[in-house]
């Protein structure tokens, strides 16, 4: 990738629309754009940081192609810090492709996927967590996902990491000074104090790592399986959560024989709901296959709703088996059909219990709230700057492991030269999170997941 090239790409999604945008960036962006434009009022130049009305023309034939609005962002006050020109025309794919062709004919290069954002990163306008947030913002499916991505784009992860990283740098500097100036009047940091200072770095990183479980759910969504015996109201509950009649509901046991899936937003978090076949002993081949899929869905889910019939006076043996299995994982016991009567079947199991009526809607709001509590855990939904992808999580994990190695080394009186190796191993991953020292192949992999025009 040559940062001196001028690049072009369509910045709006594929397909027809009212407006389409073609973006040019680089040293020749303004010059090339002017060749394709006939500015209103006879203007000869694009004024920086302004929108201009113009006619789009073929530079060779002079043919008028469209009426457009052109925005010129002069460097360094642009997304990439290069000169950028954005041409907004009518959103015909043919017309947008023609604009790109005209630019390519003047020596401009087609942008690689994510190249505009990669230039913003390489030119120091954003760090790597902010670049990842651009992608997350584009791909967000809920308002809460968009809000989290916007916080990341504003530098929330970097701001949260910076004080911790600075403490580590300061500790390294003190230990280095003790070694470099051992013959001078420089005191060596006692091992006990060094261990305490490592703990001050370790604690916030451990908390950041803890919050990844919630950050991952925000980013990827949560899979929630609804399981239970036949006719306990699983499909009715599913329809209540989906807020429409998505699953077939009848009084006949075994109506649901295959998995029914739907994605809903609960508190801004995408929840992938799975309605399953009622679990029981069955000699029907089709139903047996559905029951096996139910058990697999329960095993694969992030959260399980075990639905039982609260109207039944005594709990069924299979209910207790499902409750016992669910107690070993993240689960909620739903005592349904409370409109017909209430008989608790929880029997003291250590999982949250919510009582509902899928028919009347009673308890459904409480169920949604309990699901969100289970998802949020102790990380807290209000705290900004949490990790949202595996790359960031693994780097924090690597840093924590190196800090623990440094602590162990100090406890057995290993020379500070060896301790410093562990501390540098803890610092490098923190630099990699923001992209301060990330290798080119990793950068190429990250930015290749972006769309062409971003």
Swiss-Prot record:
GO terms for molecular function: GTP binding; GTPase activity; metal ion binding. Its cofactor is K(+). Residues 221-376 form the TrmE-type G domain. Keywords: Cytoplasm, GTP-binding, Hydrolase, Magnesium, Metal-binding, Nucleotide-binding, Potassium, tRNA processing. It is found in: Cytoplasm. One of its GO terms (biological process) is tRNA methylation. GTP binds at residues 231-236, 250-256, 275-278. Mg(2+) binds at residues 235, 256. Its EC number is 3.6.-.-. SUPFAM superfamilies: P-loop containing nucleoside triphosphate hydrolases (SSF52540). K(+) binds at residues 231, 250, 252, 255. Binds 1 potassium ion per subunit. GO terms for cellular component: cytosol. InterPro entries: G_TrmE (IPR031168), GTP-bd (IPR006073), GTP-bd_TrmE_N (IPR018948), GTPase_MnmE (IPR004520), MnmE_dom2 (IPR027368), MnmE_helical (IPR025867), P-loop_NTPase (IPR027417), Small_GTP-bd (IPR005225). Its main location: cytoplasm. (6S)-5-formyl-5,6,7,8-tetrahydrofolate binds at residues 23, 86, 125, 454. NCBIfam families: mnmE_trmE_thdF, PRK05291.1-3, small_GTP. Belongs to the TRAFAC class TrmE-Era-EngA-EngB-Septin-like GTPase superfamily. TrmE GTPase family. Homodimer. Heterotetramer of two MnmE and two MnmG subunits. Exhibits a very high intrinsic GTPase hydrolysis rate. Involved in the addition of a carboxymethylaminomethyl (cmnm) group at the wobble position (U34) of certain tRNAs, forming tRNA-cmnm(5)s(2)U34. This is tRNA modification GTPase MnmE. It comes from Koribacter versatilis (strain Ellin345).
């Amino acid at each position: 990738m040559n940062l001196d090239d001028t690049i072009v790409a369509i910045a709006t999604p594929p397909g027809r629309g009212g407006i389409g945008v073609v973006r040019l960036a680089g040293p020749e962006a303004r010059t090339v754009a002017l060749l394709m434009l006939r500015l209103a009022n006879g203007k000869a130049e694009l004024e920086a940081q302004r929108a201009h009305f113009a006619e789009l023309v073929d530079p060779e034939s002079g043919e008028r192609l469209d009426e457009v609005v052109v925005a010129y962002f002069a460097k360094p006050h642009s997304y990439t810090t290069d000169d950028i020109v954005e041409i907004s025309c009518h959103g015909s794919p043919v017309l947008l492709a023609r604009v790109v062709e005209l630019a390519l004919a003047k020596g401009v290069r087609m942008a690689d996927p994510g190249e505009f954002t990669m230039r913003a990163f390489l030119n120091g306008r954003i760090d790597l967590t902010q670049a990842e947030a651009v992608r997350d913002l584009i791909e967000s499916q809920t308002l809460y996902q968009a809000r989290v991505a916007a916080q990341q784009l504003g530098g929330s992860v970097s701001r949260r990491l910076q004080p911790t990283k600075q403490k580590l740098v300061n500790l390294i500097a003190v230990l280095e000074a003790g070694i470099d100036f051992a013959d001078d009047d420089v005191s060596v940091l006692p091992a006990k104090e060094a261990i305490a200072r490592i703990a001050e770095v370790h604690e916030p990183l451990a908390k950041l790592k803890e919050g990844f479980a919630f950050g991952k759910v925000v980013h990827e969504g949560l899979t929630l399986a609804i399981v239970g015996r036949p006719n306990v109201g699983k499909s009715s509950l599913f329809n209540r959560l989906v807020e429409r009649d998505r699953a077939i509901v009848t009084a006949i046991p075994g109506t649901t024989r295959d998995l029914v899936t739907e994605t809903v937003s609960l508190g801004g978090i995408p929840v992938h709901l799975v309605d399953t076949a009622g679990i029981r002993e069955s000699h029907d081949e089709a139903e047996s296959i559905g029951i096996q899929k139910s058990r697999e869905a329960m095993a694969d889910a992030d959260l399980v709703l075990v639905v039982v019939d609260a109207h039944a006076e005594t709990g069924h043996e299979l209910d207790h088996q499902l409750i016992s299995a669910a107690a070993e994982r993240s689960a909620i016991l739903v005592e349904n059909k409370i409109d017909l009567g209430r008989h608790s079947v929880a029997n003291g199991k250590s999982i949250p219990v919510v009582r509902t009526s899928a028919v009347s809607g009673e308890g459904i709001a409480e169920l949604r709230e309990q699901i969100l509590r289970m998802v949020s855990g102790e990380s807290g939904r209000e705290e900004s700057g949490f990790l949202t992808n595996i790359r960031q999580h693994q780097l924090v994990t690597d840093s924590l492991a190196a800090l623990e190695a440094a602590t162990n080394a100090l406890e057995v009186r290993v020379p500070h030269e060896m301790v410093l190796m562990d501390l540098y191993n803890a610092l490098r991953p923190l630099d990699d999170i923001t992209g301060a020292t990330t290798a080119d192949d990793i950068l190429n992999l990250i930015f290749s997941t972006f769309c062409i025009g971003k």
